């Protein structure tokens, strides 16, 4: 099996399509920052946007969305990669020394819904790409990915219409350096339950370490 992580270059899409015609052993995903940002609308060499592979141009972004809307991606990942502000070189502006990664796990669903709704993405399809499909890929479909009797009680209460602007004091992960600051997003996570334990209440983290190591069985 071959899995392609974090596809950002649309040039790879046709090759992947052609290969998928002859095998079911090839899977591919992409990440929110490649679908939300584009090179024309971010500052040149700004360390806060540094990631690998890099964020690309608008036309590339459009082609990634076309592929997603036509059921090309097997699922979506977060590629959450936080770092202390000093490692992102926010003060020095040194792009080459900066940590290559974007922190955004908390905003994965709102970011994708904000960008996706404008393009006609159905919320049910988006949720499947973030839950059911990755669970199946990981061999966890017997306990994860659906609201079903006997499954783990992993539940997210999501207000798809509520808008909010990302500010530092609403960020729940330790390191606050993220390019999503000052972005206005549509759709807000209100409550989250992990294994039946409420870990987010009224959009605030209230419980740590409720998760468990997940192993394919």
Predicted regions: what they are:
Residues 1-76:
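Histidine/acidic residue-rich metal-binding segments in metalloenzymes
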Residues 2, 29, 79, 112, ...:
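Residue-level signal for inorganic ion chemistry
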Residues 54-55, 147, 180-184:
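Short Gly/Pro-enriched turn/cap motifs at secondary-structure boundaries
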Residues 70, 74-75, 82-162:
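His/Asp/Glu-enriched, well-ordered alpha-helical/loop segment
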């Amino acid at each position: 099996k071959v899995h392609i992580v974090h596809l950002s270059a649309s040039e790879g899409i046709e090759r992947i399509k052609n290969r998928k015609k002859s095998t079911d052993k090839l899977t591919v995903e992409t990440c929110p920052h490649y679908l939300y940002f584009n090179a024309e609308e971010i500052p040149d060499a700004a360390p806060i946007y540094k990631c690998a592979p890099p964020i690309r141009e608008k036309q590339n972004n459009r082609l990634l969305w076309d592929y997603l809307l036509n059921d090309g991606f097997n699922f979506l990942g977060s590629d959450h990669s936080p770092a202390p502000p000093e490692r992102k070189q926010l003060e020095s502006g040194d792009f080459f020394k900066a940590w290559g990664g974007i922190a955004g796990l908390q905003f994965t669903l709102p970011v994708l819904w904000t960008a996706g709704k404008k393009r006609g993405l159905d919320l049910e399809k988006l949720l499947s790409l973030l839950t059911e499909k990755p669970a199946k890929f990981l061999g966890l479909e017997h306990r994860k990915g659906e609201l079903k009797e006997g499954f783990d009680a992993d539940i997210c209460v999501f207000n798809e219409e509520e808008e909010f602007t990302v500010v530092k004091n609403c960020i729940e992960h330790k390191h606050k350096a993220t390019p999503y600051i000052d972005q206005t997003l549509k759709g807000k996570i209100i409550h989250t339950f992990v294994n039946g334990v409420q870990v987010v209440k009224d959009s605030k983290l209230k419980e740590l370490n409720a998760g468990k190591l997940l192993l394919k069985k």
